[in-house]
Amino acid sequence: MTMSDLRRRGLLIILSSPSGAGKSTLARRLMAWDETLSFSVSATTRQARPGEEDGVHYRFLPEAEFKSLVSSGQMLEHAHVFGNFYGSPMAPVSQAIEAGHDVLFDIDWQGAQQIRNSDLGKHTLSIFILPPSIPELKRRLESRAQDSDDVIEKRMRKSWDEISRWDAYDYVLVNDDLSVTEERLKTIITAERLRREQQPALQTHVRALQTEFEDLEQ
């Protein structure tokens, strides 16, 4: 049996960071590096905005259906934000990882904690991206030219609450050089894919080795 025959389970890869730390750019680079990586499609009870497609940008659900999924344990994580519910349905993620595909999650520390405590928690890899400094974080937000000064100020105030949760993650990277951080992320993911728990065919392979060994001794 070759390494290519040892089909692996996929990983639930959680990327978290304060806004402006480079998480979205890194996620795009990871998906360009490995086309089997995909983002988890969240479910929400809010109305679709112009241009949004059901099943592509979000799964748009009635509130009763969303709550039913939560109460029956079919949501990996969920939250109530500005009057609407958001969450990650378990079924499509389970199907993806059993097929050997990794799923990316762009969620905060609370969502990460819920996923780690779920039935799929043992297949979770959590990574937090830190900025090199607070002034640099603010500079990056300002350089986007996407938000007003008030919005930037709100993002900056929220950033410390997110940064203070850094020690709840498996890996923490300081993104002072995007290319270096990208390579470190790839190294982490490559190694985590080889965890014993992620390779269910190993047991069969070892049994085959045992049989071959016993045949040699006969």
Curated annotation (Swiss-Prot):
Entry EC no(s): 2.7.4.8
SMART domains, per database record: GuKc
One GO cellular component, as annotated: cytosol
Coiled-coil regions listed in the entry: none
PROSITE patterns per record: GUANYLATE_KINASE_1 (PS00856), GUANYLATE_KINASE_2 (PS50052)
Molecular functions (GO terms): ATP binding; guanylate kinase activity
The entry's keywords: ATP-binding, Cytoplasm, Kinase, Nucleotide-binding, Transferase
Catalytic activity of the protein: GMP + ATP = GDP + ADP
Guanylate kinase-like domain span: 10-190
UniProt key word Cytoplasm: yes
Location(s), subcellular: Cytoplasm
One Pfam family from the record: Guanylate_kin
Uppermost EC category: transferase
Superkingdom, taxonomy of origin: Bacteria
UniProt: ATP binding residues: 17-24
Family stated for the protein in its record: Belongs to the guanylate kinase family.
Functional summary from the UniProt entry: Essential for recycling GMP and indirectly, cGMP.
HAMAP family: Guanylate_kinase (MF_00328)
Protein name according to UniProt: Guanylate kinase
Species whose genome carries this gene: Jannaschia sp. (strain CCS1)
